[in-house]
Regions:
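N-terminal secretion-targeting helices of virulence/extracellular proteins
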Residues: 1-102
Length: 102
């Protein structure tokens, strides 16, 4: 007789992690927009050093946004690989592993 299927604790945890990662990635994408806009306005700090600083700030901001998206993409990929339903024995093993009791 087939063992009863139950929701996967790992799948559920990955879903929660994805929500958090997407939220944080959105925060990161907006993190330096105010500073960048202020610098681009020409009313905060001007000159060659200011222009260089602004360019570096924007480059780092873009890189940070890409890295945050990489985290979201990795969690999504792992979620796709994780079945939403597993046997009770598998679910129990996952719970033990997630609790550090392997």
């Amino acid at each position: 007789m087939a063992e009863r299927m139950v929701p996967s604790p790992r799948h559920e945890r990955l879903r929660q992690l994805l929500v958090e990662a997407e939220y944080r990635a959105n925060e990161v994408r907006q993190a330096y927009q105010r500073a960048s806009s202020a610098m681009r306005s020409g009313q905060v700090w001007t000159g060659p050093t200011a222009a260089t600083w602004t360019t570096e700030l924007e480059a780092r901001h873009q890189r940070l946004g890409r890295l945050a998206q990489n985290v979201v993409d990795a969690v999504e990929e792992e979620l796709r690989r994780s079945p939403p339903l597993v046997t009770e024995a598998e679910a129990n093993a996952m719970r033990r592993e997630m609790a550090g009791r392997t």
